[in-house]
């Protein structure tokens, strides 16, 4: 054990250790990238015309997993002996920037195809739902930017300059099943029906054979969306806007129909159920749907004659296996989508670096792949659920020294590292995976 230093100023600093690796834990996620065939998939499907696209995408994703939020941060992989723990040649930041600027809309769609096939490989290796039910949460988020030279950046409903990507996440794991970059002025539901069509195809190819249920907030509600979900045999639980028809349906609920429920600490809420008739302007589309309403008390005082006593939150669902209270509990769990979005924006999606819109779309697609690799590292490593920042602190950004003992390469990590057992267990489990067929 080193003695306690009372004079911290006595140390000189040099940057001359060729065998030191700043982010040696990348060996874990790099092993998973290799097992899932990421570089091969990119080389096969992304045809930008540039040399070794798989090498460049892998470089960018590895840097993102190490905490990169700017293109220049890729240089962290070129420091010391970091290259030795990666199964591909690390490219320079200038090369990565040039590569991103070669992207067009079609090339971004090719990168989406890579993400879909990578998802299928990960699920085939054991991370997928198989025959179990799959709950999908839809949401959009604002990726704020600064500067007016960014193509596609605009002011949306939040009055912030940025982009407005759409994501579909898997409840329980936080994986991003599908994503689509959109310009900042896009409405929440823009392109949602085409998005669902593509998402259904991705899940089918990934062999998710169980029941599928989609949850979404009122920004996505439309009768056309319900028809799209019905066409793909997906159940749904979607918040509705309290328009005059919904308010009339709520007003028709008898007072004795409301049931008290467990709610947030210090809060009080009740739920009830009724029906809602709608479907669109065409008579052939008319339908009766199940409307579940939760109301929360605005005030505890009795002096509320001129004001409404309750705030109502309404959603429609076609789930018949849940009673009113269970349906409300299930719908409230849609909030977990915000955790996945927070992790995305706490990592590479924190910053959208380029002035070119397709380059930023490619950056966001790579950020989604990096996010999923972090999730799969936890799942395949059979580790307790942790967020990406915790995973990065415990497993990825741990330093090590490269050593050669009798011809066997060894990474020497710090003694008394608090999570060394978890590190070794996850690495062993990931190494035990078999690569994709073909």
Residue ranges, per PLM feature:
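Dynamic "connector" segments at or just before major functional cores
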Residues: 1-187, 192-206, 378, 400-438
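Short, surface-exposed connector motifs at secondary-structure boundaries
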Residues: 205-212, 231-232
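An anionic, glycine-rich sequence signature occurring as long contiguous blocks
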Residues: 2-11, 235-345, 431-438
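Basic, amphipathic alpha-helical segments enriched in Lys/Arg and hydrophobic/aromatic residues
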Residues: 351-417
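Acidic/histidine-rich, metal-coordinating catalytic segments
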Residues: 139, 210-221
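A short alpha/beta connector and helix-capping loop motif
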Residues: 149-161, 223-240
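Short amphipathic alpha-helical "interface-anchor" segments enriched in bulky aromatics
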Residues: 32, 74, 326-375
